[in-house]
Swiss-Prot record:
Record's function text: 3'-5' exoribonuclease that releases 5'-nucleoside monophosphates and is involved in maturation of structured RNAs.
Keywords of this entry: Cytoplasm, Exonuclease, Hydrolase, Nuclease, RNA-binding
Region of interest: Disordered: 739-821
Protein's name according to its UniProt entry: Ribonuclease R
GO cellular component: cytosol
Enzyme Commission number(s): 3.1.13.1
Length: 821
């Protein structure tokens, strides 16, 4: 054994694993860090004081493995070096439909640090690959560019696409536009796929820079336009687990819909308490039930009973492992991919009416001013007295006589809930929580599963009442685990970053609005802004820009508060049937209850509680945040597809809308009735040169003074629908804004915007090249009425003509196609 053994903190582990151990990976990395120079294998062998051929071979294998995993880089001088010392970056590939790609550094959540990979660097890469790249300068547009060093981990999972057979060759065009390669399929591996079928494939050969990729068909999904196909594509494209492993099927095989009598023992009996569930009409899994009563001295006592999933789903079981893998249920417009099997999610765990169910209860006291003055958690058994809907409760509160008579025993309790809600709402407003009134839409399907209509979802007081009750239970639960210093996941929403905040303030300034609070505005400052825009016709668009300026909420083991709700602590407790973080919190709370009562056994309790480490929570936080984003991306993609399918029947129609977003290549219009967005491309506007003003969020015509600005009311004609790229193209018919001649103010603003953009470009070019560019090197900032050379929905200025088979592969309908997104 070498003399370095006593210095290696992992020497014992290595000695357990190998007869003739060598230094651990961790020690080698630390050694090279201290050495601060690349070293070849022989020098390392001597420096680590290793001996003999066996240890030399062991070192060779370890260094190769560390190189493979991206921990070390083997340089051209035959030396091993640390990637960070060579300014190399590890990250995930994000493909682009035009053929190039980006590498997002590991751990980064936004695109600010992304590195561009040119087209030729992407020939052997696929969206989702984990790679090592070396920055190699900037491109002509000032974007950081990189060179592929090594693929550290190939994208796992399968690819969905359309199958084609031409000139004796079979190939698949991926449905995901971020995968730019057509995949060649040997004819004996097509699995019976027919021309135009949607198929699932696996890559069998990554190919080279001169030869394309190859794969095999593993599943034929069916015809492209079959009902529900958009959901099946999204499930597989986003790698959402949707089939139950055999071990899970075996574990739930013996379950029935009746709670075993022994499971009810030792619990608080709440079956006589008139708890009710209040959900949407389409709900099938009922997580929560509520009951409220007034206190004699003022204020209220509130019971929030939540399905006790942790009793049935124990740590480290097959059910638990699959729940971790899924992270959450995914709700598509016409299908649900549940986190738990249906026998649990819709049966044994669901708080269905008039049946006994196990539950976790958060019993709270609320003061007359809406403050949470006390809480306690316990395990109970309950029996829901009614399955109510938001619509029914709203109508009962509005005085519907028939419903009030049908539920007369529950009406007083519902009215008490409503009184408490009004006080809670006032308290929420007082603390400065930001309340958004965004419009959500709902797809109405006919018997053939085709879209019949798209309708807005109306939120009434019943929705908000339940929301406030759930928020209160989440606050109480977060307070409990924080006070006990128990490892759990918090729902964290951080304040906006400086760059986005500045951009949002510039936008508000153009509208004559202001966000107070200086460099660190509080939630109250945002809430005051929301009050200012309450009656404005462009309220929804301002809210959209506000949301874009915000960071995304995540799950984290470290509590950093919830900015949007203006809370110091917050966690998810109320939906364990459909969210894994809630299940983790239930286990932690059960452990604390058992610990207080002396019933815990080491890290676990008899009824499903468990004590996790903070390292465990770090892992679960990343996993659950990822699965949440995955679900959001998949459902948004399906929603966009369905909107395009619906709009195919409206091509040629003229509809009212509002300018919802402005870019350098045109502006997006949101239809007033349908809440669907489409693009009015700059090339379809009146013949003029248009300048993009990013601060004012507008396009300004140079010659005739035409202005197209965020929030303008317009009428558009549906020009084309592209199902492939989920794009809808509009043509402007008329606008509420009048032309303003030469428009001195408009031209002044455009000149300012152009000068600012020119200054930024000069600075970027000078920074990249070390000298100022010549006049001939600068591109004009004028946008002509053509498809511009820009990202987004525009085509590159210089590209090869598309291949004939590619055009055929992309066609799915007879509608006009325009790949400009």
């Amino acid at each position: 054994m070498s003399d370095t053994t006593h210095l290696d903190p992992f020497a014992d582990r290595e000695a357990d694993n190998y007869d003739n151990p060598i230094p651990s990976r961790e020690y080698i990395l630390e050694f090279l860090t201290q050495a601060n120079v690349p070293m070849n294998r022989n020098d390392l062998f001597e420096a680590l004081k290793l001996e003999g051929e066996e240890q030399y071979e062991g070192l060779r294998r370890r260094l190769r493995a560390m190189e493979r995993d991206g921990q070390l880089v083997f340089t051209r001088r035959q030396c091993y070096a640390l990637p960070e010392k060579l300014e190399m970056v590890k990250g995930y590939v994000i493909g682009h439909k035009d053929g190039h790609g980006w590498v997002r550094p590991e751990g980064s959540l936004n695109k600010e640090g992304d590195i561009l990979l040119p087209h030729h660097q992407m020939r052997t890469l696929i969206h989702g690959d984990f790679v090592l790249v070396q920055p190699s300068g900037t491109d002509k547009r000032g974007r950081k560019e990189g060179r592929l060093v090594r693929i550290l981990e190939e994208r796992n999972g399968q690819i969905v696409g359309r199958f084609f057979f031409e000139y004796g060759y079979s190939y698949v065009v991926p449905d995901d536009s971020r995968i730019h390669h057509d995949i060649l399929i040997p004819n004996d591996l097509r699995a019976g796929a027919r021309m135009g079928n949607v198929v699932v494939i696996e890559i069998t050969d990554r190919g080279t820079r001169n030869r394309g990729m190859m794969g095999k068909v593993v599943e034929v999904l069916g015809e492209n336009m079959a009902p529900g196909m958009e959901t099946q594509i999204a499930i597989r494209t986003h790698q959402i687990p949707h089939e139950w492993p055999a071990e899970v099927e075996q574990q739930v095989a013996g379950l029935t819909e009746e709670v075993p009598e022994e499971a009810k023992q030792g619990r608080v009996d709440l079956r006589a308490l008139p708890l009710v569930t209040i959900d949407g009409e389409d709900a099938r899994d009922f997580d929560d039930a509520v009951y409220c009563e007034a206190k004699k001295g003022g204020g209220w006592r509130l019971w929030v009973a939540i399905a006790d999933v942790s009793y049935y789903v124990r740590p480290d079981t097959a059910l638990d492992k699959e729940a971790i893998n899924r992270g959450n249920s995914v709700y598509f417009p016409s299908q649900v991919v549940p986190m738990l099997p249906e026998v649990l999610s819709n049966g044994l765990c669901s708080l269905n009416p008039q049946v006994d169910r196990l539950c976790m209860v958060c019993e709270m006291t609320v003061s007359e001013t809406g403050k949470l003055s006390g809480y306690k958690h316990y395990e109970a058994v309950m029996n829901s007295h009614a399955r109510l809907t938001y619509t029914k409760v709203h109508e009962i509160l509005e005085g519907d006589e028939e419903l009030r008579e049908r539920y007369k025993a529950l009406v007083p309790h519902l009215e008490e809930l409503h009184k408490m809600y009004q006080v809670l709402k006032s308290a929420r407003d007082e603390r400065g929580a930001i309340e958004f009134e965004t419009v959500e839409t709902k797809f109405i399907f006919n018997a053939q599963r085709k879209i019949e209509s798209i309708e807005p979802v109306v939120r009434n007081d019943a929705h908000k009442l339940i929301e406030e009750c759930m928020i209160l239970a989440n606050i109480a639960s977060a307070s409990l685990v924080e006070k006990a210093k128990e490892a759990a996941l918090y729902r964290v929403h951080e304040p906006p970053g400086e760059e986005r905040l500045t951009g949002f303030r510039d936008f508000l300034g153009e509208l004559g609005l202001d966000l107070s609070g200086g460099l660190e505005p509080s939630p109250t400052d945002y809430a005051n802004l929301m009050k200012q825009i309450g009656e404005r016709p462009d309220k929804e668009l301002i809210q959209t820009m506000l949301l874009r300026s915000m960071k995304q909420a995540v799950y984290n083991a470290d509590n950093a508060g919830h900015f949007g709700l203006a809370l110091k602590r917050y966690a998810h407790f109320t939906s364990p049937i459909r969210r894994y973080p809630d299940l983790l919190l239930h286990r932690a709370i059960k452990y604390l209850i058992a610990k207080q009562e002396g019933r815990n056994q080491d890290r676990w309790t008899p009824t499903g509680g468990y004590h996790y480490s903070f390292d465990d929570m770090d892992f679960y936080g990343e996993q659950c945040s990822m699965t949440e984003r995955r679900a959001d991306d998949a459902t948004r993609e399906v929603s966009d597809w369905l909107k395009c399918e619906y709009m195919q029947d409206h091509v040629g129609e003229e509809l009212e809308g509002v300018v919802a977003n402005v870019t350098s290549f045109g502006f997006f219009v949101r239809l007033t009735e349908l809440h669907i967005d489409g693009l009015v491309h700059i090339s379809t506007l009146a013949n003029d040169y248009y300048h993009y003003d990013p601060i004012g969020q507008r396009l300004v015509g140079e010659s005739f003074g035409a202005i197209y600005r965020l929030g303008d009311a317009v009428k558009v004609k549906v020009l084309a629908v592209n199902l492939d790229d989920r794009q809808i193209d509009f043509e402007l018919v008329e606008t509420s804004r009048k032309l303003r001649g030469q428009g001195k103010t408009a031209k002044k603003r455009a000149d300012e915007a152009r000068a600012k953009a020119q200054g930024k470009k000069e600075a970027a070019t000078k920074g990249a090249c070390g000298k100022s560019p010549t006049k001939s090197e600068l591109k004009p900032q004028v946008e002509a009425t053509r498809r511009p050379d820009s990202e987004g929905r525009s085509k590159p200025k210089k590209t090869k003509a598309p291949k004939k088979r590619k055009d055929q592969a992309r066609k799915k309908s007879g509608k006009v196609r325009d790949k400009t997104k």
